[in-house]
Swiss-Prot record:
Keywords: Mitochondrion. Essential for respiratory growth and required for maintenance of mtDNA. Required for cell survival in the absence of prohibitins. It is found in: Mitochondrion. Its main location: mitochondrion. This is Genetic interactor of prohibitin 5, mitochondrial. One of its GO terms (cellular component) is mitochondrion. The gene is GEP5. Belongs to the GEP5 family. The keyword Mitochondrion applies.
């Protein structure tokens, strides 16, 4: 079955870079059932009808899901390894705070929790006390990780809706987790709220690392160069060109910059479409 899927994919008129990525990641992809299944579905749809929409879904899967399999960015590896630190420092707000802000005419502009210190966060939620470590190094890593997620990581506008076309990516702070009120007006239990925070941390991880991960800068540059060379040739089909152009419009890349005064790397995101005009 997998051999047939690969044979059909090789017959599709895609850019050579796309074929190279699949060949490089094939052995690892077939061992991950969900990733391989999505790839096989996209290939089947393109084989039935070579439309721009089907091609866009296929090339998005190839370049955003398969390509980063062997080159997950350092900040996402840190996100994965420091799960408990993220849970402990995730910004939260109660539904009562939102309602009070709306009564004062501030609408949804309640972003104070993003500026809270770790001490205030621990004091607010009893279930975080058990995760608090006295090691200064670990606390420092928590602060750095929290700052990275809030100020650098592109996130959703409040929730992850499962849309994988990249349009939900923004460059704002990480979404607040809302502690809801019960029908009687009391705050929901700590256990239920703890699970809600964990769910938000996991959902954001899936969005940033699984559904729509960033392209590495070398990969983005190579994709732009390859597309520019191919667009001027007569053998390039219009639907294929449109699919890759739409991919570039929705894609984003990242760079790490270092300064003399800062030991930690500063993470910066940019749209790949900005590279096309250069």
């Amino acid at each position: 079955m997998s051999g047939r899927v690969l044979e059909v994919f090789r017959g599709l008129p895609l850019l050579p870079l796309s074929h190279e990525i699949v060949a490089r990641c094939w052995d690892r992809m077939v061992r991950q059932r969900d990733v391989y299944y999505q790839f096989a579905v996209h290939v089947s749809h393109c084989h039935e009808r070579l439309s721009t929409r089907n091609l866009l879904r296929l090339v998005t899967h190839v370049h955003h899901v398969l390509a980063p399999m062997n080159e997950l960015p350092a900040h996402l590896r840190q996100y994965q390894s420091e799960y408990h630190a993220l849970v402990a420092s995730w910004p939260t707000v109660t539904e009562r705070q939102i309602l009070d802000a709306m009564e004062l005419g501030k609408g949804m502009a309640v972003r104070i929790p993003h500026n809270k210190t770790l001490r205030q966060m621990f004091e607010q939620h009893e279930w975080l006390v058990q995760q608090r470590l006295l090691d200064d190094k670990r606390l420092k890593r928590r602060r750095l990780l929290r700052c990275e997620v809030q100020m650098a990581t592109p996130t959703t506008n409040g929730s992850t809706n499962g849309n994988t076309n990249g349009s939900e990516i923004s460059f704002r702070q990480c979404p607040l987790t809302i502690r809801e009120l019960t029908p009687l007006g009391a705050l929901e239990s700590e256990a239920k709220f703890k699970n809600r925070v964990r769910s938000d941390v996991h959902s954001l991880w899936r969005l940033l690392a699984v559904q729509h991960p960033p392209l590495s800068r070398p990969h983005a540059d190579e994709l732009v160069r390859t597309l520019k060379r191919t667009l001027g040739t007569s053998r390039t089909d219009r639907s294929i060109a449109r699919a890759y152009l739409q991919l570039l419009q929705r894609a984003y890349t990242y760079t790490y910059t270092y300064t003399d005064t800062e030991a930690e790397a500063q993470l910066q995101y940019s749209r790949v479409s900005q590279l096309v005009s250069h």
